[in-house]
């Protein structure tokens, strides 16, 4: 980038090469109007000194004076930063370098902050999280208290509902037990009225066995005759003969298995 009607001086020690002629300086003139204001040389634009580097780093600074002061350059570069942050960071005017050629190295932060690592300018950023934590803890406690209160009321409601359910279940069980008792009482009289099973006497069994020996199937007349003689009902005699026939079949089956298993017989 160049500006019209400007004279650019290039120093020999800075830009030297074996391929270039060893002239002291090269002057370039441009035929433009001289009314345009003079600007600083290209050396000052290309190699700014913000007061951050040691003067011995750049050897060319010993022969040329800085057109802009370090304060103005620093102010121009920090225009976009917020004023509050700039006030906190740049507290002392001694932090800036007023002369680039003879200025000493500049330290932006002279002291160490609270945490022992960052400078003092970062203390405000460290205070904000702690304050947020301190404000968040009471809110958390309040929310915990609210949640605990809600849970306590919910538990009380659940306990009341459980008690009510238990009472209802107990009443239902009592009603069911009373109903069962009534049903048992209603069913018990018929069972008591039922006649007990009385075995046949020896005389009755002997007469029935003798009749079964002659006739496996008994007719109705013979059955009525036996019932009158043995003082039994017609139905009892009929059932006894049915059971006796089933018993006889079982005995015959057992005899058959016994003889087939023993070939000696």
UniProtKB/Swiss-Prot annotation:
MF term (GO), any: DNA-binding transcription factor activity, RNA polymerase II-specific
Main subcellular location of this protein, as a coarse class: nucleus
Keyword check for Lyase: no
Stretches for region Disordered: 123-199
Gene3D superfamilies linked: Homeodomain-like
Compositional bias (Basic and acidic residues): 158-168
UniProt subcellular location: Nucleus
Keyword NADP in annotation: no
GO cellular component: nucleoplasm
DNA-binding region: 193-252
UniProt-listed InterPro entries: DUF3528, HD, HD_metazoa, Homeobox_CS, Homeodomain-like_sf
Disulfide bonds: none
Assigned keywords, A-Z: Developmental protein, DNA-binding, Homeobox, Nucleus, Transcription, Transcription regulation
Compositional bias annotation for Polar residues: 177-191
SMART domains attached to this UniProt entry: HOX (SM00389)
Membership in a protein family: Belongs to the Abd-B homeobox family.
Physiological role: Sequence-specific transcription factor which is part of a developmental regulatory system that provides cells with specific positional identities on the anterior-posterior axis.
Protein name, UniProt field: Homeobox protein Hox-D11a
Name of the gene: hoxd11a
């Amino acid at each position: 980038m160049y500006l019209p009607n400007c004279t650019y001086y290039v120093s020999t020690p800075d830009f030297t090469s074996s391929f270039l002629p060893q002239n002291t300086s090269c002057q370039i003139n441009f035929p433009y109007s001289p009314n345009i204001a003079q600007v600083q040389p290209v050396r000052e634009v290309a190699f700014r000194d913000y007061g951050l580097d040691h003067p011995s780093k750049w050897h060319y600074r010993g022969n040329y004076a800085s057109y802009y002061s370090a304060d103005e350059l620093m102010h121009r570069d920090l225009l976009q930063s917020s004023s509050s942050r700039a006030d906190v960071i740049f507290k002392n005017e001694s932090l800036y370098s007023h002369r680039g050629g003879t200025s000493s190295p500049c330290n932006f932060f002279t002291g160490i902050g609270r945490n022992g690592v960052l400078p003092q300018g970062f203390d405000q950023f460290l205070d904000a999280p702690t304050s947020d934590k301190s404000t968040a803890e009471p809110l958390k406690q309040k929310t915990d208290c609210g949640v605990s209160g809600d849970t306590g009321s919910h538990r009380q409601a659940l306990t009341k509902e459980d008690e009510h359910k238990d009472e209802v279940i107990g009443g239902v069980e009592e009603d069911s037990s009373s109903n069962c008792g009534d049903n048992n009482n209603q069913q018990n009289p018929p069972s008591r009225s039922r006649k007990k099973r009385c075995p046949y006497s020896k005389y009755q069994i002997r007469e029935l066995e003798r009749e079964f020996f002659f006739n496996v199937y008994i007719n109705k007349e013979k059955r009525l005759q036996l019932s009158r003689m043995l003082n039994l009902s017609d139905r009892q005699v009929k059932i006894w003969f049915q059971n006796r026939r089933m018993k006889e079949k079982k005995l015959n089956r057992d005899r058959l298995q016994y003889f087939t298993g023993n070939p000696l017989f």
